[in-house]
Amino acid sequence: MSKADLIIGSQWGDEGKGKIVDMLCANYDYVCRSGGGHNAGHTIWVDGVRYAMHLVPSGILHENIINIIGNGVVVNPDVLIAEMAQFKNLKGRFFISEKAHLNLEHHSLIDQAKERAKGDKAIGTTGKGIGPAYADKVNRTGHRVGELLNPEKLCENLMKEFDENAKFYDALNIKIPEKIAVFNELKRFKEFLAPYIANTTEMLWKALDENKKVLVEGAQGSLLDIDHGTYPYVTSSNTVASGACTGLGLAPKDIGEVIGIVKAYTTRVGNGAFPSEANDEWGEKMCQIGKEFGTTTGRKRRCGWFDAVCVKYSARLSGIDKFALMKLDVLDGFEKVKICTAYKLNGEIIDYFPCNLESVEPVYEEMDGWDSIKGVKKFSDLPENAQKYIKRIEELTNMRAGFISTSPERDDTIIL
């Protein structure tokens, strides 16, 4: 019996998980998504071509791999259908859990209306309806992908719920759709998606029993976890390693190696605490060189120095075995680089991740920078200062480096 390996974002998302998943895919039979929705963007560069995916697992670029969207994902059928249209011959190699919840148009309208109402206190969601879809799931009023197989019944249930909540929608200035429009849309969803809806939990159990190799592609980052992240500025699902179990129907003993993905610096989209944020020329330089604009929203990402305290916390939460250091080349040419090694909280130096992260000040260690590393494929060929930087990150986070990315291209990666 085999185990499922995990790739987990260890910061606030956008770490570069897609590249590592794509690089490792050839060694696996299955690639799965276990949580999140189309708020998460996966970007892969192959032969200079950029592929941006939001729901479909990154393994879809390999025709011999079976790709699964698990029950923990909230699925927007419109987005999924448009994304699937980019790829050929999906039947038999792409499946959606019948238990995954639907993220429909009214969810995004609610999301956007609530964010507008909060004004300057807005969380900074993507406005894609992820939170409202998960809220319906927890409230036991949501609808699942399997219900698309009976669009007549699903339409009746949705219209009944719209009527029951008419005052709520009116207060948010959201117009309730006509029944015929809802039915026609659900019918279209069924016609396109029905061949791909399956009992993916049983499928994965059988795969592991048959010693197939399974890779789970995490969405977003550990610091956005609904329980362990910088609440309330978080996402609506569990993004740490344990979320893969509930999001796919796996047992803890089914989990094998856990690989954490970290950038050589730190980024964050939206509001919330960010101790090592660099609101200066260096942060702007990271943003421009690293092309730090969201795959999903196009929003400019906030940039800052590597935060070893945050990453050490993420590593412990997910039991990370080794990490992949991404975008090291973005720091090429920096005369000095910094690492946040601790925090100052109420005058005291701490080395742990507190609940009130917004109250801390960063404590930095400064190191000498390096010249270009772009395209380097051997650790020994890296400049000495770049090697020192990596080793210092290993020491501070209690993890070992397994991969070092030296450019966006798939092959420009040092494997240790």
Curated annotation (Swiss-Prot):
Compartments it resides in: Cytoplasm
List of residues binding IMP: D14, E15, G16, K17, N39, A40, G41, H42, T126, R140, Q220, T235, R299
Record-annotated active site: D14, H42
GO molecular function: adenylosuccinate synthase activity; GTP binding; magnesium ion binding
GO biological process: 'de novo' AMP biosynthetic process; IMP metabolic process
Binding of Mg(2+), residues: D14, G41
Binding site for substrate: T295, T296, T297, G298, R299, K300, R301
Pathway(s) the chain acts in: Purine metabolism; AMP biosynthesis via de novo pathway; AMP from IMP: step 1/2
Cofactor binding: number and manner: Binds 1 Mg(2+) ion per subunit.
Positions bound to GTP: 13-19, 41-43, 301, 327-329, 405-407
Reactions mediated catalytically: IMP + L-aspartate + GTP = N(6)-(1,2-dicarboxyethyl)-AMP + GDP + phosphate + 2 H(+)
Pfam families according to UniProt: Adenylsucc_synt
GO cellular component: cytoplasm
Oligomeric form and interacting partners: Homodimer.
Its job: Plays an important role in the de novo pathway of purine nucleotide biosynthesis. Catalyzes the first committed step in the biosynthesis of AMP from IMP.
Family: Belongs to the adenylosuccinate synthetase family.
Protein name in UniProt: Adenylosuccinate synthetase
Biological source species: Campylobacter hominis (strain ATCC BAA-381 / DSM 21671 / CCUG 45161 / LMG 19568 / NCTC 13146 / CH001A)
Gene: purA
